[in-house]
Regions:
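Helical "lid/coupling" subdomains associated with nucleotide-phosphate turnover
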Residues: 1-46, 61-205
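A short acidic Gly-Thr/Ser loop motif
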Residues: 50-56, 113-116
Length: 205
């Protein structure tokens, strides 16, 4: 998304002699689908996979073990913190997209990916295979909002980079749960990096 992205990549490749490939949201979804995620989900149910980053968030719908659709939106933790003027428009687009593509899908649940949801899950002391409920996520969100930036660092032990972005990240997951009518969110220890390794091994990318 960076305006100087191509220039930056060229400079890195020149200095390191390492080729860099920039992937879009659609390809990212396919790479994630190639992970062992399929072993963790129930083939009879439907899931909305949400990967929250700093500048964008990827949404992928799975149902009965198949990838139905995927879309990347330019809204992430950093963009929300910066109060980007386009945020309101993008929020509406996300709500519409999720509502349309999860309509009619029963037994819906979220699958969360990203450093912030991993931290939230760790703080919950929940067992690895168990999900977090919408009620818990909402209560945790309200709890975080009441604390100052300094309190989130000193009392919760969050690092400085995490202490500010964890609130907008939680808002994204909560909104996705609400719009998809999901009552729980799973947080597996599988993500894009796992998919890249597996895809490279099998010659997919």
């Amino acid at each position: 998304d960076a305006s100087n992205g191509k220039k930056l990549i060229a400079e890195i490749e020149k200095e390191t002699e390492i080729n860099i490939e920039v992937i879009n949201g659609e390809k990212e979804a396919k790479i994630i689908a190639s992970t062992d995620l399929s072993k963790l989900i129930d083939g009879k149910k439907s899931y909305l996979y949400v990967d929250v980053g700093g500048g964008s968030t990827e949404f992928t719908v799975f149902s009965k073990g198949k990838l139905l659709c995927s879309k990347s939106f330019k809204i992430g933790t950093v963009r929300l913190l910066n109060n980007n003027t386009d945020n309101k428009i993008i929020w509406k687009e996300i709500k519409t997209w999720i509502s349309v593509h999860t309509k009619g899908l029963k037994k819906m649940a979220l699958i969360g990916s990203g450093g912030n949801i991993n931290k939230i899950f760790k703080m919950s002391n929940q067992r690895p295979e168990k999900p977090l409920s919408y009620i818990y996520m909402n209560a945790h969100y309200q709890f975080l909002k009441k604390m100052t930036y300094e309190e989130r660092i000193s009392e919760l032990g969050l690092n400085q980079d995490r202490a500010d972005v964890i609130i907008p990240a939680t808002k994204i997951y909560l909104s996705a749960m609400k719009w998809s009518k999901s009552k729980k969110i799973y947080v597996p220890k599988i993500g894009l990096s796992d998919g890249i390794v597996k895809s490279l091994y099998h010659g997919i990318i």
